[in-house]
Amino acid sequence: IIHVSRNPKDNCLSIFENLFDYPEGWNSDQKELAEYYLIYKDLMEFWNNIFRDSILNVRYEDVILDTEKKIKELISFCDLNWEDSCLDFHKNNNPIKTVSFNQANKPIYKSSIKKYELYEKELEVLFSKLD
């Protein structure tokens, strides 16, 4: 199991920005989004206690800042062989059916790290619950 976590504020900002079409609407309500995030955080803590040796926890920011090292750790955890092409993921022409399709065909970029700082005033309700 590979669990990638991210700065809670950046993570929630990304969810908020992407307008996922969930009928419950939790992703577009600052208070509810914060509550869901905190539930997720507690749940991951629970799973980490149960499956400690089976979960590799990776911070998104670490992958961005030290890509090769972190991808090598992921590859090793999966008991796969390293190939230099692992760093060329953005050159893959296979279709991508996720909200990140537009990002996955580009090299890694740092502009999403601490992006939340641009919206601290507008998302004060959300961010105050995550502190």
Regions found by a protein language model. Give the residues of each.
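PAPS-dependent sulfotransferases, especially Golgi type II membrane carbohydrate sulfotransferases
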Residues: 12-57, 64-131
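A short beta-strand-to-loop transition that corresponds to the Sensor-1 phosphate-sensing loop
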Residues: 5-8
